[in-house]
C-alpha cells in the first residue's frame, strides 16, 4: 500500500521570523499524525533553519529546484550534493513556473531527475498541461511526453522511490481545481502509462495532485484511489490550513 505524501512548496515566500513561526505551528498542528508523510520546501537559504526548527518531528525537508552540476563555476546555482548536505530530501523539479519562466525543457528536467537519483535524493517530478492544452484535449499527450523524458532515458526503475506531482497549470494559484473525478482520471492514466513498462513500479510510485489544493477540497481529492497526497502551494504557508490537508490525506488512506 502506498503511503501518502503531502508536501508544501513555499515558493518565493519566507523570512527567519516566518520560518520559526510556521514550523513551530506545524509541529503543534501535526503532532500525532503518523499516517501521512509530510515535507516542506522553503527557499534554499531557509532550509537549514527549517530543518533545525523541525528537529524531533516527522516533518521532512525539501527544495524547490536543483542544478545539474555537483560543483564548479556555475554562479548562482545549488547542487544536489549541497541540498543533501543540509538535509533536504524531496526535491521539486519541472514545476510549471520553472518550465514557463526559466524555459526548462523536458530533457533538462530528466537530467535533473537522474542527478537527484544518483545522489540518493527523491525527485518530485511535476508534470501537467496548460489551459490551452487541456481545452484541446491534449492532457494525456502532454503528461505522457513529460514522463517519457525520464522513462526513455532512465527506464521505469528510475521511478522507484520517486514522486510524481500532477499539476494542471491552469489550476495553479488560480483558485480553480480539477474535479476529483478529473484528477483521478489523469492520475490513473499516469500510473497506467508507467505500467506499460513496469507494473510493479507503477503500483508503488506516489502520484500527488498539485492544483489549488485547499482545506475544502482535500478530502474528496484524497478519496480517489490513485491520488496519493498533494503538492501544496498557497495553503502550505498557513499551518492550520496545511494541517487540515495532511490530516485529510491520513484519514482518506486509512479508510
UniProtKB/Swiss-Prot annotation:
Disruption phenotype: Cells lacking this gene accumulates methylglyoxal and are unable to grow on glucose, lactate or other carbon sources.
Keywords tagged on the record: Cytoplasm, Gluconeogenesis, Glycolysis, Isomerase
Active site: 95 (electrophile), 167 (proton acceptor)
Induction of its expression: Induced by CsrA and repressed by spermidine.
Domain of life where this protein originates: Bacteria
One GO cellular component, as annotated: membrane
Residues binding substrate, per UniProt: 9-11, 173, 212, 233-234
BP GO terms, sorted: gluconeogenesis; glyceraldehyde-3-phosphate biosynthetic process; glycerol catabolic process; glycolytic process
Enzyme class: isomerase
Subcellular location: Cytoplasm
Pathway membership: Carbohydrate biosynthesis; gluconeogenesis; Carbohydrate degradation; glycolysis; D-glyceraldehyde 3-phosphate from glycerone phosphate: step 1/1
EC number: 5.3.1.1
Catalyzed reaction equations: D-glyceraldehyde 3-phosphate = dihydroxyacetone phosphate
Recorded GO MF terms: identical protein binding; triose-phosphate isomerase activity
Assembly with partners or alone: Homodimer.
Family designation: Belongs to the triosephosphate isomerase family.
Function: Involved in the gluconeogenesis. Catalyzes stereospecifically the conversion of dihydroxyacetone phosphate (DHAP) to D-glyceraldehyde-3-phosphate (G3P).
Protein name: Triosephosphate isomerase
Gene responsible for this protein: tpiA
Amino acid at each position: 500500500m502506498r503511503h501518502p505524501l503531502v508536501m508544501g512548496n513555499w515558493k518565493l515566500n519566507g523570512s527567519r521570523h516566518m520560518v520559526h513561526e510556521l514550523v513551530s505551528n506545524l509541529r503543534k498542528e501535526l503532532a500525532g499524525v503518523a499516517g501521512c508523510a509530510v515535507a516542506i520546501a522553503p527557499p534554499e537559504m531557509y532550509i537549514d533553519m527549517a530543518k533545525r526548527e523541525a528537529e524531533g518531528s516527522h516533518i521532512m525537508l525539501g527544495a524547490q529546484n536543483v542544478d545539474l552540476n555537483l560543483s564548479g563555476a556555475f554562479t548562482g546555482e545549488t547542487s544536489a550534493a549541497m541540498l543533501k548536505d543540509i538535509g533536504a530530501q524531496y526535491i521539486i523539479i519541472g514545476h510549471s513556473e520553472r518550465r514557463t519562466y526559466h524555459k526548462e525543457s523536458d530533457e533538462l528536467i530528466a537530467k535533473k531527475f537522474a542527478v537527484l537519483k544518483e545522489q540518493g535524493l527523491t525527485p518530485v517530478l511535476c508534470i501537467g498541461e496548460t489551459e490551452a492544452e487541456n481545452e484541446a484535449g491534449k492532457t494525456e499527450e502532454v503528461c505522457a511526453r513529460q514522463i517519457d523524458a525520464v522513462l526513455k532515458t532512465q527506464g521505469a526503475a528510475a521511478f522507484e522511490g520517486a514522486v510524481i506531482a500532477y499539476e494542471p497549470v491552469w489550476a495553479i494559484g488560480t483558485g480553480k481545481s480539477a474535479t476529483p473525478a478529473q484528477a483521478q482520471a489523469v492520475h490513473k492514466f499516469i500510473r497506467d502509462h508507467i505500467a506499460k513498462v513496469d507494473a510493479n513500479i507503477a503500483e508503488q510510485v506516489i502520484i500527488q495532485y498539485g492544483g489549488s489544493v485547499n482545506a475544502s477540497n482535500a478530502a474528496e481529492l484524497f478519496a480517489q484511489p490513485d491520488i496519493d497526497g498533494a503538492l501544496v502551494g498557497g495553503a502550505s504557508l498557513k499551518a492550520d490550513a496545511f494541517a487540515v490537508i495532511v490530516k485529510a490525506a491520513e484519514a482518506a488512506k486509512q479508510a
